[in-house]
């Protein structure tokens, strides 16, 4: 099992990656490189992953914060 701090850093990197993917997706849509259907499909996929990561981040921040009391 990974160290909690290490896992927290990994989640932060994943969050940044998803933000960059969304930015790139928006640029592609604005340049008309993808259809609206492709955009919506990929956007939903990224949003689901983002929500998962943010949920885990909140949990890990709580856990890491609790560990400082011991």
Each model region followed by its residue ranges:
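Heptad-repeat alpha-helical rod positions in long coiled-coil/spectrin-like domains
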Residues: 13-16, 23, 27-30
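Amphipathic alpha-helical coiled-coil segments
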Residues: 18-22, 45-65
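Short, charged, amphipathic alpha-helical segments
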Residues: 36-47
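Short, charge/polar-rich alpha-helical segments
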Residues: 1-13
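Generic leucine side-chain signal with a strong bias for well-ordered alpha-helical environments
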Residues: 8-11, 25, 57
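Short acidic DE-rich linear segments
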Residues: 1-2, 62-70
């Amino acid at each position: 099992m990974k160290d909690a701090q290490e896992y927290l850093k990994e989640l932060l990197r994943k969050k940044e990656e998803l933000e960059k993917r969304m930015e790139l997706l928006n640029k592609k849509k604005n340049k008309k490189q993808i259809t609206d259907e492709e955009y919506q499909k990929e956007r939903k996929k990224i949003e689901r992953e983002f929500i998962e990561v943010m949920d885990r981040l909140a949990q890990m921040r709580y856990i890491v914060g609790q560990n400082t009391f011991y």
